[in-house]
Amino acid sequence: MVITRFAPSPTGFLHIGNVRAALMNFLLAKKSKGEFILRIDDTDPERSKKEYVDAIKKDLEWLGLEWDRVEHQSARLDLYDSASDKLRSKGVLYECFESPSELDLKRKKQLNMGKPPVYDRAALSLSNEEKLNLKNERGNGHWRFKLEQNRIEWTDGILKDLSIDAASVSDPVLIRADGQYLYTLASVVDDIDMGITHVVRGSDHVTNTATQIQMIKGLGGEVPNFAHHSLLTGPGGEALSKRLGTLALKDLRDAGIEPPALCSLMARLGSSQ
């Protein structure tokens, strides 16, 4: 059975680009009589607001994109605990203690030398004593996933054959120093646990997909079919943003735009029709 998901973060109102992703996942699931899951990415307690959760549901209902069930990532922290413990036991999740300013300085030095700004894995060479001293001085560190530095390849549902050299990508941070789980880990764990078969999202996630494929395999999950669509931009060519409210769906609704017209445009946009 085809199982898809739409996973917005409740940090602002949905914009037209979000609608396009939601519509694609909804149609893909319903075409195959599958399941469409609304997954609220609310692992950030400071930025996530209930008013935005309610607004997301209202927008999807207005469009007629009815979900089969709702999941909240904030209620699934135990699963993320178990997954991170598993990755630690396999030696692919390691603690780092650099501050944001230190990491920024490293990136600038690499760029000045004509090198890609990739994390140098300095934390992997720390002795146990050095780790203990840093923890005493700075507190808990953040945790990174150790990528296998080979090419990650997959056949994308839209972009076809893709290949990313993992050596050109920094080991992704999965857990912040304050213990908060970041999107990359939560998304992978949920996709595995919910049996997601297809993921349709923006092309800005292509590099994320490469790292997530390695993480899914590291956790023993089955890699879903990925498809990355082109991104929409605002009137001035700027990227759409929930926080900035660019082309917010609520504004289009208030302007009298009808749901069928909007869905029809989003479904055909970028196609030969």
Predicted features and spans:
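Active-site cores that bind ATP or allylic diphosphates and position pyrophosphate for catalysis
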Residues: 95, 99-228, 233-240, 248
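N-terminal Rossmann-like or analogous alpha/beta NTP/dinucleotide-binding catalytic cores
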Residues: 1-113, 207-221
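An acidic- and aromatic-residue-enriched active-site/binding cleft used to recognize and process polar
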Residues: 9, 41-43, 202-204, 231, ...
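Short, conserved loop/turn and helix-capping segments at secondary-structure boundaries
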Residues: 19, 50, 202-209, 243-246, ...
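Short helix-capping/linker segments at secondary-structure and domain boundaries
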Residues: 31-35, 194, 270-273
